């Protein structure tokens, strides 16, 4: 592997050359985007939730039976956790999109120095560890699966992808709650910017469809409980009647490249990552900082990293999970950073379509943001019908809006006061 020292190089320009996604809407990025722009929803009533036990019966659940199986079959697939399989399939889709794989799904370029910056908060805890624990209690030590400890750990998604494609470069896995996806992409961006790798697969994956996980958020009173008979209207980001979020799941991956590396292989360039930063509220493990100051710090720092002035931002892809406190705190952060312009910058949240995908949320939303730059369309915020005076922003509600966006931000915020912000741009030669 080529040794690189961050202090010995000039910062690199970092571009996006491929995207891949699995969501409750569809098993590909293109289909997910098309459905979101058309106002679709992947939120449904879940089959495994007992109405007597669960006040929220809804989920944005991935169609497990319809998942692609292009890169892993047989015993290897059986011994790989769902979160890792989703990561592999969406990473593979992104690599195909980037022109990195041939017809046999093998790399067409040397990926020895390429790396992975991934994230997940749950890993295989519910899909693998809990069932193994039940087996252990009922049938004893001898019946515990021998492959258990190479299934549920968080870092196995990155390993699965790097092993499949021979990627021997940097490898990291972050778990920063709902900011994870944006932070993983930001970490991949910085790895390339500072010369640690020429190419990174970056994103996050999350499998949340388990009654215990649902129960935990119900106990926190974070989930919407007024829409069990009307799933389409359950998640209402920024709307004055919002009453909690809906759990979602999925995986989103992007191919990030050093611009020179992408040009040398003749890659199609989708967008450019200009900046990234993270911060912490240092306020409360669950509640956001009410005045939005912690989130504003991340946004300001990302703009500084990008050498971009607030006046240059033309669109905001919001976190907005459809909670009363969180959506207002985010709006206050936006007003704090952008001042009088805040009310005229188009803002959208896609959680009304796919729910809150936890670690994968920021990654899937970044992919939609990239498509916004490429296609010139801002996707709608589903169920935005009643403006909240405490929000006071230009929310793109219910219908997609045509807009030629040059530079935008993508925000993600999470439990533990985690904040992350990416600055994304339409690619230009200069």
Over which residues does each language-model region extend?
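Condensing-enzyme catalytic core mediating Claisen C-C bond formation in acyl metabolism
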Residues: 13-17, 40-45, 230-306, 314-315, ...
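ACP-dependent fatty acid/polyketide chain-elongation machinery
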Residues: 1-76, 98, 260-272, 367-381, ...
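Short, well-ordered amphipathic alpha-helical segments that serve as non-catalytic structural scaffolds
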Residues: 86-99, 157, 257-259, 292-307, ...
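Active-site-proximal alpha-helical scaffold in enzymes
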Residues: 87-100, 154-157, 162-165, 171-206, ...
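Conserved small-residue
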Residues: 18, 36, 91, 116, ...
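Acyl-CoA/ACP chain-elongation machinery
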Residues: 47, 196-243, 276-290, 320-327, ...
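Glycine-/small-residue-rich "gating" segment that lines the acyl/pantetheine channel
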Residues: 137-145, 186, 190, 194, ...
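Conserved beta-ketoacyl condensing-enzyme motif
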Residues: 16, 40-176, 205-214, 310-326
